[in-house]
């Protein structure tokens, strides 16, 4: 198995924004602190091979959210900051496909394969991955280039960020996507 430039795989970087650096805001615990570094490695590969890149930016409609466009947390993290000519998709819901032209852009470019990395595993990454799979794209979800935060259960129990992350990945694997690592992708592109 290999992904070649000819296959035109797109890299979707989901919500790698400064607001996610505020761990306390999101629950107090985060897994995989190296996720952005792994995403940056993928981005460098895509840039060097001149393959399509889509930066997805969550623009919360909640004026109090640190991901609202008026807040500095809305900005992309420097490690994956878009360069001139790279497509930015702005969304205000969990899916990068809802209320955006992402599907149209992918289809117009005859892209059949998407590689997904970003934040957070159980929210926007999961929703976008599910929709990409439902739309028929060949989806690779990069486990070490995604991360999430701890959650409180409906009965008040605490779930660690790692448990939430692994459960989200398990729910997506082999149904909506192939869950793989950055190293796996490096070997096949």
Q: Where in the sequence are the language-model features?
A:
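Acidic/histidine-rich helix-loop elements
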Residues: 21-33, 156-158
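N-terminal nucleotide-binding beta1-loop-alpha1 segment
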Residues: 11-16
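Active-site gating/metal-coordination segments in enzymes
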Residues: 4, 20-21
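Active-site-adjacent betaalpha module
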Residues: 1-10, 37-41, 48-49, 61, ...
């Amino acid at each position: 198995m290999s992904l070649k430039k000819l296959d035109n795989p797109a890299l979707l970087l989901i919500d790698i924004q400064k607001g996610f650096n505020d761990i306390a805001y999101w629950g107090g615990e985060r897994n995989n602190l190296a996720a952005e570094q792994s995403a940056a490695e993928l981005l460098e590969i895509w840039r060097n091979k001149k393959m399509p890149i889509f930066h997805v930016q969550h623009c919360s409609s909640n004026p109090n959210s640190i991901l609202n466009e008026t807040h500095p947390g809305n900005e992309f993290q420097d490690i994956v900051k878009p360069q001139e000519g790279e497509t930015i998709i702005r969304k205000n819901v969990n899916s990068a496909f809802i209320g955006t032209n992402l599907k149209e852009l992918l289809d117009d470019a005859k892209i059949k394969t998407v590689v997904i990395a970003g934040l957070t595993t159980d929210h926007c990454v999961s929703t976008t991955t599910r929709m990409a799979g439902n739309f028929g794209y060949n989806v690779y979800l990069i486990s070490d280039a995604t991360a999430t935060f701890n959650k409180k259960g409906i009965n008040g129990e605490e779930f660690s960020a790692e448990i939430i992350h692994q459960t989200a990945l398990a729910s997506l694997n082999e149904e909506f996507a192939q869950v793989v690592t950055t190293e796996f992708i490096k070997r096949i592109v």
